[in-house]
C-alpha cells in the first residue's frame, strides 16, 4: 500500500467518523425537537391577583396542567390550586386534578407523585408542554418540588 493510499484511507476514515458523528447529533436534535417541556408554575400566596405575569403566561401556554388536591373527610376532592386556576379563568379542559394523600406515611404521597410523573413524561415525550401547579412557590415543599427529581 502506497503513501497516497494510506492518506486516502485515513481521510476516508475521518470522513466516515465525522459523518456518523453529525448523523447522531441530528438524530438527537430531531428527537428533542418533538419533546415537550415541563413547567413548575407557582400560583403565589393564595390571592389570584398576586400571581406573576410569567406564571399566568405559562398557564395559558401549556397544553396540560397538573393540579394537586386532597380528599376531604366527606370524600370530596379539594384543591386550593384549582380554585385559583378557576378564578384566573384558565381553560378547565387543560386541567388534570390529582390526589395527594395527606397521611403521616409519606409513601402514599410518593406513590401518587410516581403515577403523575409517569403521565407527565408520557405527555412530554409526545411533544406536549406540561405545567405542574403549586400554591406558593413551586420550589419549596410543593408537589412540583417533589416531582422535579424524578422528571429531571
State the predicted function of each range.
Residues 4-5, 19, 29:
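Acidic/polar hotspots within intrinsically disordered regions
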Amino acid at each position: 500500500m502506497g503513501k497516497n493510499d494510506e492518506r486516502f484511507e485515513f481521510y476516508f476514515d475521518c470522513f466516515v467518523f465525522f459523518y456518523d458523528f453529525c448523523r447522531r447529533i441530528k438524530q438527537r436534535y430531531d428527537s428533542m425537537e418533538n419533546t415537550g417541556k415541563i413547567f413548575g408554575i407557582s400560583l403565589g400566596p393564595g390571592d389570584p391577583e398576586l400571581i406573576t405575569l410569567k406564571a399566568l403566561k405559562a398557564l395559558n401556554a401549556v397544553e396540560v396542567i397538573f393540579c394537586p388536591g386532597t380528599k376531604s373527610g366527606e370524600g370530596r376532592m379539594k384543591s386550593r390550586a384549582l380554585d385559583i386556576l378557576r378564578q384566573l379563568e384558565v381553560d378547565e379542559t387543560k386541567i388534570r386534578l390529582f390526589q395527594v394523600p395527606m397521611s403521616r406515611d409519606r409513601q402514599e404521597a410518593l406513590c401518587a407523585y410516581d403515577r403523575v410523573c409517569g403521565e407527565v413524561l408520557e405527555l412530554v415525550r409526545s411533544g406536549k408542554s406540561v405545567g405542574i401547579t403549586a400554591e406558593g412557590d413551586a420550589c419549596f415543599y410543593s408537589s412540583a418540588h417533589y416531582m422535579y427529581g424524578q422528571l429531571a
